[in-house]
């Protein structure tokens, strides 16, 4: 993709800030639903999808709640609540439907380059955790969305599902796992690149190496963006609608916009590390996404997982994440990001959340100081035979947890202007996997007047639009069959 030439002043109906999966998804929606709208994208880096959307910067799981235990909460009475898992599964189905539509209509090609079928497994150790996992399985198995899920404590069965992890295990160790065959691995970096290739072909203006420095509301209701390119040349860009999808960089721009709902919002950055396997023989022995259970007192982002990934055209194996303490909101950000994000309007909320989350800060600092030997010890809970020389450390992307009302939130959140002329996406997990649902929320809240005329097209693109798939077993079966065929997941 080449950088677009730009005048000192410019205009577009729609402006997307940040060239990641969220902006790419919203751009695809608007290109399909309102092709008459002009579209401009500003990205501060030299290519699209280099920050949180990049395949080396996220877990790439295709978060559909098939194996992530932090989406199913155990209540005080011992029951397991699966409502959030069902909701995330429904949301991920929307993502699969949009990608299928884009492939089916030739907007993007070669789905095998960004999505693969891979089993999803939940893995726990100890009797108490085994009982929790069994209750989770029993609750989820009642839904057709999780049809085919299996549960076992039997070591021989577990060895069939995850042979690498079961080598040289103590036969008396209490283990349990749930297994579901139709999980996915999604390379969101590759998908992001495909989405922006499509947008550029549809005459979207892609401006790389362009940093948005300021956002101001004009008297006529439009937004004025002050943009600086790599050579330091300043540009003024006006737009009717602005979406801030710059990952961790979204918060400072949201604050500069001055919209009411953005004034009390803060952010807390968390960095991440993964161990990546460099031994092809070891990589070949594992073919699954295996998610464990966070240790007592550890935050949700610390859930350990051993992931088969498909990156740069080959199978890879990653373990993590190991969290870390940072002041940066972006991997290529500044140590001033966090301090300068604290303003008079959010100071009380950020301070309150900071006091409440001192244990989290302590945990992150401890994680940041772990040696490779300590990280290998964590890995050996999953892979007892893991050898130091087979594993290297890679630095993953940044996530910025939303702080609102004195509370730290562990999800994604859309914040918008009252008139719907500006929206920003903040937060993290499940993130990219539910990007389609997140951008649908933007369409509904920001383009309400146009939504009625888009209904038929939206239903064509997303057959489950407006429906709860948990209550539609027949529709779900039809959608799954189509998705598997179009995205080459059936074999």
Swiss-Prot record:
GO terms for molecular function: 2-hydroxyglutarate dehydrogenase activity; L-malate dehydrogenase (quinone) activity. Its EC number is 1.1.5.4. It catalyses: (S)-malate + a quinone = a quinol + oxaloacetate. Pathway: Carbohydrate metabolism; tricarboxylic acid cycle; oxaloacetate from (S)-malate (quinone route): step 1/1. It holds the Pfam family Mqo. GO terms for biological process: tricarboxylic acid cycle. Keywords: FAD, Flavoprotein, Oxidoreductase, Tricarboxylic acid cycle. InterPro entries: FAD/NAD-bd_sf (IPR036188), MQO (IPR006231). It comes from the Bacteria. It is an enzyme of class 1 (oxidoreductase). Its cofactor is FAD. Belongs to the MQO family. HAMAP family: MQO. This is Probable malate:quinone oxidoreductase.
């Amino acid at each position: 993709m080449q950088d677009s030439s730009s005048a000192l002043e410019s205009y577009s109906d729609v402006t997307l800030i940040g060239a990641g999966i969220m902006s790419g998804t919203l751009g695809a929606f608007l290109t399909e639903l309102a092709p008459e709208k002009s579209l401009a994208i500003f990205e501060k880096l030299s290519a699209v999808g280099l920050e949180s959307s990049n395949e080396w910067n996220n877990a790439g799981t295709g978060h559909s709640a098939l194996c992530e235990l932090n989406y199913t909460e155990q209540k005080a009475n011992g029951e397991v609540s699966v409502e959030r898992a069902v909701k995330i599964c429904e949301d991920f189905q929307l993502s699969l439907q949009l990608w299928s539509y884009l492939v089916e209509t030739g907007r993007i090609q070669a789905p095998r380059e960004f999505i693969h079928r891979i089993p999803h497994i939940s893995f726990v150790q100890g009797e108490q955790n085994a009982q929790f996992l069994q209750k989770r399985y029993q609750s989820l198995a009642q839904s057709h969305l999780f049809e085919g899920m299996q549960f076992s404590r039997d070591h021989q069965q577990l060895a069939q599902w995850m042979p690498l992890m079961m080598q040289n295990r103590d036969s008396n160790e209490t283990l349990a796992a749930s297994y579901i065959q139709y999980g996915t691995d999604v390379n969101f970096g590759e998908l992001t690149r495909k989405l922006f290739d499509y947008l550029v072909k549809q005459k979207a203006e892609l401006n790389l190496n362009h940093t948005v420095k300021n956002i101001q509301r004009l008297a006529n209701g439009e937004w004025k963006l002050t943009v600086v390119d790599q050579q330091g040349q300043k540009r003024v860009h006006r737009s009717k609608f602005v979406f801030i999808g710059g990952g961790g960089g979204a918060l400072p721009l949201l604050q500069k916009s001055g919209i009411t709902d953005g004034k009390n919002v803060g952010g807390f950055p968390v960095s991440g590390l993964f161990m990546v396997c460099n031994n092809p023989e070891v990589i070949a022995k594992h073919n699954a996404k295996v998610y464990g259970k966070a240790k007592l007192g550890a935050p949700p982002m610390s859930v350990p997982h051993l992931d088969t990934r498909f990156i740069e055209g080959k199978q890879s194996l990653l373990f993590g994440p190991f969290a870390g303490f940072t002041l940066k909101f972006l991997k290529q950000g500044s140590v001033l990001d966090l301090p300068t994000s604290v303003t008079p309007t959010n100071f009380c909320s950020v301070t309150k959340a900071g006091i409440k989350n001192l244990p989290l800060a302590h945990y992150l600092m401890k994680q940041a100081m772990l040696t490779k030997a300590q990280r290998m010890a964590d890995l050996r809970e999953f892979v007892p035979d893991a050898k130091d020389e087979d594993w290297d450390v890679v630095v993953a992307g940044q996530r910025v947890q939303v702080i609102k009302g004195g509370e730290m939130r562990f999800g994604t959140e859309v914040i918008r202007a009252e008139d719907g002329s500006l929206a920003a996406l903040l937060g993290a997990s499940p993130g990219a996997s539910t990007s389609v649902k997140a951008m649908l929320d933007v369409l509904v809240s920001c383009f309400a007047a146009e939504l009625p005329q888009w209904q038929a097209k939206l239903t064509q693109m997303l057959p489950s639009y407006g429906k709860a798939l948990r209550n539609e077993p027949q529709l779900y079966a039809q959608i799954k069959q189509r998705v598997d065929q179009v995205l080459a997941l059936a074999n």
